[in-house]
Amino acid sequence: MTTARPLTRRTLLLASASLAASGLSTLSHASAPWPSKPIRMIVPYPAGGVNDVVARMFGDLMAQSLGQPFVVENKPGAGATIGMAELVKASDAHTFAFGAISPLTLNPYLMPVAYHPLEDIQPVASVMYSPVLVLATTAFAGKTWDDVLAQARTSQGVSVATSGYGTLAHIMVEQLIRATGGNFVHVPYKGGSQLITDAAGAQFDLLLVNPFAPINALIEQGKLRVLATTGPARPASYPQLPTLGELGFDKANLVSMFGFYAPSNTPPEVVERFNQEVQRLLATSDMQQRLRKLDNTPHPMSVEDFTAAIRRDYALNGVLIEKAGIKAQ
C-alpha cells in the first residue's frame, strides 16, 4: 500500500523535470501523439526555386525522424502572401510554411494581405540567411566602395538596380540615401530576367541582389564585380570583401532571412518540437554544406529569438517606409 504524501515545492519541481525529460512525443496526456498524420508544407514560391529546394530537403529528413511524410504544396503569388494567407487557415497543428520573412516584415506595408503578420502567424524556426551582393556593372568606372560614395556625392549620382519596388534591396537603397545623403537613384525591375539582361548590358551602375546562378555566371564572365556584401560576417564565397556593416553602414547591412512558420493557434509544444528538429539538422555538416552550396548561411535560432527578430524587423521597416515615402503599389 502506498501512502499519499502532501505536494511540496520540491515534489512539484521534480515532477516538472520528469515531464520535461519525457520529451514532446505527445502534446498532453489526453491528446494523440504528434505528428499523427502527414505534415503539410506550404511553399509560397514556385517549384524548383531555392525556397522549394530547401523546404523539400528538410521535409525529407524530418519525415524520417518524425515518422510522417511531408507533403509540399507550392502556392506562389503576390510576393508570397497568397501562400501565407493559406497557412493561417489551418488549425490542425500539422500545417507549416517555409520561406523568407518579408511576407511578415515588409509586404504587409506595401500590399493588401489576408492576415496580420504578428497575430496570425507563429515564427517556428530560422533556417538560413542569404547575403545581398553589392555589384558594379562595367558602366561603373570605380573599383571600390569608396568610389561609389565619391560618385554619389556628385550630380552624376549612382544608379542602383534592384529586383523590384518595396523589396529588401529597395530598403537598402533608402538606408544608404539616409546614411550618406548621396545621390543614389533607385532603378526597380519587375522580375529577374530583364534585370539580368540589363546587368550584362551595363544599363545601370550598381546592382543589389542575392547571389544566384545567373548572377554568379556574370561575375565569372567579368561583367559584374562584387564591391561589398552584407551579413553579420563575411560570406564564405567572398571572404576578401567587406560587409556594409564593416564599412560603417549597419542599417543597410541587411540579409534575406528564411525560416519555417505555423498558424498562431499551433500548440507551443509542437512549435518547440519542430524548432528542435530544424536545429538538429542545421547542426550537421551535411546540411550546412548543402545550404552553403545554395549561397546561404545556416542560421539557427530559438523560437523566441526568431519571433523577436521578425517583430523587430516589422517595426523598423514600418518606420523607414513611412519616412522614405514608399507607397503601396
What do the predicted segments below correspond to?
Residues T2-L14, S18-P33:
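N-terminal twin-arginine translocation
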Residues L27-M41, S91-H94, L149-V158, E220-K223, ...:
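Immediate post-signal peptide segment of exported/extracytoplasmic ligand-binding proteins
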Residues Y129, P214-A283, A315:
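C-terminal lobe and pocket-closing loops
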Residues S159-Y165, A169-L241:
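Ligand-binding pocket segment of bilobal, Venus flytrap-like solute-binding proteins
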Residues K89-H94, Y109-Q194, L244, M257-R290:
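Hinge/capping helix and adjacent helix->loop/strand transition within the periplasmic-binding protein
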